[in-house]
A protein has these predicted regions:
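Bacterial N-terminal signal peptides that target proteins for export
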Residues: 1-7
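Hydrophobic helical h-region of N-terminal Sec-dependent signal peptides
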Residues: 8-12
């Protein structure tokens, strides 16, 4: 199956539900992660950010909550990257990196890829975003993770 076909199947599946298992024993934190990603896929970045903030409040050691904050602060088809969003995203992903030792290998991969997007300064962001896009696309192509495939497709837009 080609990447576009895989992405289409993932989009259709995600249209009704999103489950993004993360390393937490807190059901409300997991629910907030799932809701945040669902809202992100619906281009509701503000709502997604609030959901990821909620996940972090339930489980402050959850790297993926801070990864989600960085994701939600990033650009989408309707919202360009700004310096203010960049600063929040960079702070969040740096915190996720610090917490990622307790995360699964899959989660560490998502965190490491997002860290590429915010590795430099806002002035360097276009190059860093290209590095993120390339890494996310490679991960999506090598994994069977629907969320990686959706995020890769979104990064290509």
């Amino acid at each position: 199956m080609t990447l576009p076909a895989i992405v289409l199947a993932a989009v259709l599946s995600a249209a009704t539900s999103v489950h993004f298992p993360v390393s937490t024993n807190d059901p409300p934190a997991q629910a907030a992660i799932d809701r945040g990603l669902f809202l992100y896929y619906a281009y509701k970045g503000d709502g997604a950010g609030r959901s990821f903030d909620e996940a972090a409040s339930h489980d402050p050691g959850l790297a993926m909550a801070f990864w989600g904050i960085a994701l939600a602060e990033g650009p989408d088809l309707n919202t360009p990257m700004t310096a203010a969003h960049f600063e929040v995203a960079q702070r969040a992903i740096r915190h996720a990196v610090l917490l990622s030792g307790a995360a699964s290998e899959r989660e560490r991969t998502f965190v490491a890829i997002m860290a590429r997007r915010y590795a430099g300064t806002f002035a360097d962001w276009n190059a860093d975003d290209a590095a993120y896009r390339d890494a996310m696309t490679a991960f999506a192509e090598s994994s069977h993770d629907e969320n990686a495939q959706l995020l890769a497709a979104e990064a290509l837009l």
